[in-house]
Amino acid sequence: AYLPDAYDFQTELLEFAKARVDGGGAPIKMRLVKGCNLEMETVISSLKGWPNPIRPSKTEVDANYLCLLERGLMPENARVLHLGVASHNLFSIAYAYLLAQKYGTTGYMTFEMLEGMANHLWRAQSMLGNRVILYTPVVKNEHFLNAVSYLVRRMDENTAPDNFLTHSFNLKPDTKEWDFLAKQFEEAYAMKDHLTHVSPCVQNRNLPYTPVAPSDTMQNEPDTDFDLSQNQEWVRRIFAKWKKSGTEEPEIIPLQIGAETVVCKNRYKYLDRCQNDEVCIC
């Protein structure tokens, strides 16, 4: 939900799922999360010279989560695109529960949580009869270093000042912590129907190159963002331009040794690893 174009991704999934079900296929499932790789998105975009793709505030992220949640639980959508509500935020969980009750789509929804993060919440969910998927991290001893990044993320979530889990221990109504979290939810709820869903990532390699004016500071050209459809089309055109076939006349590049030019008449076929089973002639 931290991506502005998450709404478009949900639209694509819904269109695919509806066509699949209408054609006699089974529904698919979408797992809705708030900020699984949010920090990494910021780091990667900075290193590659791209705009930061995430929403600028936690309130906007929460609002987008509620927007996608409401859309996903509507009967016409939930029957083809089942929803996994991944959250440890009591207010978000309660909102999803009430929405599903309102729309009659409880059977198409599961709650998804992490072992050890908020065990009292998933236990309460189970007591209510809700379906809960509990994720438990498992790692072999020889791969334990791979768990460090996971543990650091969990520690960060449990200590971030705006994060629900920071205030969740011994949380009670009519306390300072409760009022703070309730206000967070109310602000997000008020914003959910007024969001724009436009990504700041608009790089387009099809456009003519515009030289950058000289400056005292050297700036690298941003890396090409191959996630963007317009850049994928740009690459396809380049590939089509230079793609060779085994039936074509090979380009002859003579070998020059000193003043002598040597042209070999032998022809050999080699597997072109860029074109699967095609061969190029040398």
Which role fits each region the language model picked out?
Residues A1-D216, P222:
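Positively charged, amphipathic and often flexible ligand-engagement surfaces
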